[in-house]
Amino acid sequence: MHLNSDYVKTTDEINVKELFVLEDLTHELKPYSEIEENLKKMKVLAKEEEPQNVLKIKKICDNCSFKDYCWADMPKISIFNIPRIGMKAEMLQEEGILDAKQIPPGYLTSATQSKWVEVFKTGKPYINKESIIAWLNNLKYPLYYFDFETINFAVPYFKNTHPYEHIAFQFSLHIQQKPHGDLEHKEFLFEGKEDPRYACIEAIKKFIGPKGSIIAHNARYEKDIIEKLATLDISEKDKDFLLSLPNRFEDTCEVFSKYYFHPDFKGSASIKKVLPVVCPGLTYEDMPVGNGGDAMSAFMLLYFDKLPKEEAQKLRKDLLAYCCQDTFAMVKLVDFLYGCI
């Protein structure tokens, strides 16, 4: 039995029969019938000398609790730091190559991957100034640096939502009228017990003007949330406004995925990897709310009144500070890009 991802809560009550799906997995349980016999063999092995690890190391190991053990001899910058390395990683291992700096020239056919190998070998950034200039020239002021925080309930809590649907409860917005110009900060964090999405829509309408580029890091996420908001029971005027926003987005993640690579990014364009490198001193470390998971947990505590008043007030400030940091970070990333040209 598992959650039905197609289920939509249409009333105040959950339809349990529709929420869950029964699936026959008998055929997948067959291997488990051998567990008892395998345990006997494992007890025998446990008494013997530890065997050499012969398993191929894969990117999926990131989620394994034994990663540190199996990856003990892995180079600091490995072949798995090359973005989208895929099956080439297995081929390289068969040739005894784990260090990204040892990948032979021309081995990787992707131009992006080849550039990353060069960055790791030389220890110097790759900068495509022409493309960065084009990206910056495409920005239309005022700029709206925008970031959502969302919560996703396994069992839908609000009407017209499905399991694990992302529900916007907060956003931060920095507004800039010209390059390196002064910043105006706006923010929204839902207070109340209703569906936060409707108040979120009103705040978006209030703060985002009809013109200007909207900046996000990994903009697809923000665009998806906005498009989902437009499906709610709101006026046609509000729907049209929301649906006009996705086409205005520009993505800083795209720039650091294509036009600027630094060896200390270690192959990632995540803002948590990029920010400490290009903006030293600006970090999420030591923030009481320091990532999206923390933000989700914090909102749950506030929404369901799980804290004394003073603790709730402090947590609310911490939540606002975290989301503000996200959009301020994007401001600094764009400032950095201007400095590159």
Model features per residue range: what roles?
Residues 1-36, 185-296:
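Conserved DEDDh/DEDDy metal-dependent 3′-5′ exonuclease domain
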Residues 131-210:
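Conserved RNase H-like, two-metal-ion catalytic cores of nucleic-acid enzymes
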Residues 95, 139-142, 172-176, 203-214, ...:
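Generic, well-ordered alpha-helical scaffold segments in large soluble proteins
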Residues 65-66, 76, 119-134, 229-232, ...:
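Short, motif-level signal for alpha-helix interfacial/capping segments enriched in acidic residues
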Residues 72-74, 91-92, 101, 153-156, ...:
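Short helix/loop capping segments that flank catalytic or ligand/cofactor-binding pockets
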Residues 3, 12, 16-19, 23-79, ...:
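Acidic, Mg2+-coordinating catalytic module of metal-dependent nucleases/exonucleases
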Residues 68, 148-152, 175-177, 192-194, ...:
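Short, flexible loop/turn elements at secondary-structure junctions
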Residues 78-143:
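N-terminal accessory regions of nucleic-acid-interacting proteins
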